């Protein structure tokens, strides 16, 4: 059995927990320790429930509070050599990251807490952006947020997953008719920004397989999406792909508040 919880998912901040009931990891550090402590305590948990932090990329909504994490709770921070180099220069992390720095190898697998971890690169306009495949005997979870477009490698690794957390950031009609300037719209939708609902739905058709038990849609835009639009697009894709066979559970993750604590079983 795996346990999954989103503490915040969107441009306001990103932080997720994945564990097995005995140990776990955080993915990203975009919320304050005060909020994290509160949300953990509401589930009867504390900082001892995770032994490491994984970082997906160096945008501020994913690392805003990583410096205080390093200073105050001193958990090892795992990410790629490219991202650790960027964090060593970033004004929010440079004074604290050295004591917690652990490099993931350029190729192959790493043991991080209870998980065997594989990272993979995804297109996004950060220094580098990665997704993670986390494997234990209790199941395999793939996390990919802030994805400009879906790559063949990401699809292949997601097809091995029992549980999938993936971006469904914006509705194209809302984006194009909304208040954003042209340059920002293009940054979002031209392949190195974010994944639209339709792109997420198309990816799910390629990814879904009989062993996929749950899909969580993350990083929904506040201004250019709604949970219903994201859910409906991906639900229809799963209906079409599964053709009456059993479908994975589908959920959208809230932007600024924690999700429920999900128990994940293969």
Placement of each model-derived feature along the sequence:
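Active-site environment of divalent metal-dependent phosphoester hydrolases
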Residues: 12, 59-63, 85-86, 126-127, ...
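Active-site neighborhood of phospho(di)ester-bond hydrolases with catalytic His/Asp-centered motifs
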Residues: 27-30, 50-58, 78-81, 142-145, ...
């Amino acid at each position: 059995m795996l346990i999954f919880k989103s503490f915040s998912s969107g441009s306001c901040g990103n932080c997720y927990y994945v564990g097995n009931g005995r140990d776990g990891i955080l993915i990203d550090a975009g919320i304050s320790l005060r909020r994290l402590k509160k949300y953990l305590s509401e589930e009867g948990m504390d900082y001892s429930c995770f032994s490491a932090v994984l970082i997906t990329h160096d945008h501020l909504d994913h690392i805003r509070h990583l410096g205080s994490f390093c200073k105050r709770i001193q958990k090892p921070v795992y990410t790629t050599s490219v991202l650790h180099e960027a964090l060593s220069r970033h004004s929010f992390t440079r004074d604290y990251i050295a004591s917690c720095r652990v490099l993931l190898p350029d190729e192959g697998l790493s043991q991080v807490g209870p998980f065997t971890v594989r990272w993979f690169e995804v297109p996004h306009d950060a220094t580098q952006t990665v997704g993670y495949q986390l494997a234990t005997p209790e199941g395999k979870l793939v996390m990919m947020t802030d994805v400009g477009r879906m790559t063949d490698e990401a699809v292949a690794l997601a097809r091995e997953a029992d549980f999938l957390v993936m971006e469904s950031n914006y509705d194209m009609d809302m984006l194009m008719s909304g208040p954003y300037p042209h340059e920002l719209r293009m940054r979002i939708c031209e392949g190195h920004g974010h994944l639209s609902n339709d792109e997420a739905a198309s990816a799910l058709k390629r990814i879904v397989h009989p062993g996929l038990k749950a899909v969580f849609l993350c990083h929904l835009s506040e201004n250019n999406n709604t949970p219903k639009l994201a859910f409906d697009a991906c639900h229809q894709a799963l209906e079409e792909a599964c053709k009456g066979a059993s479908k994975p559970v589908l959920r959208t993750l809230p932007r600024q508040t924690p999700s429920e604590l999900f128990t994940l079983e293969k």
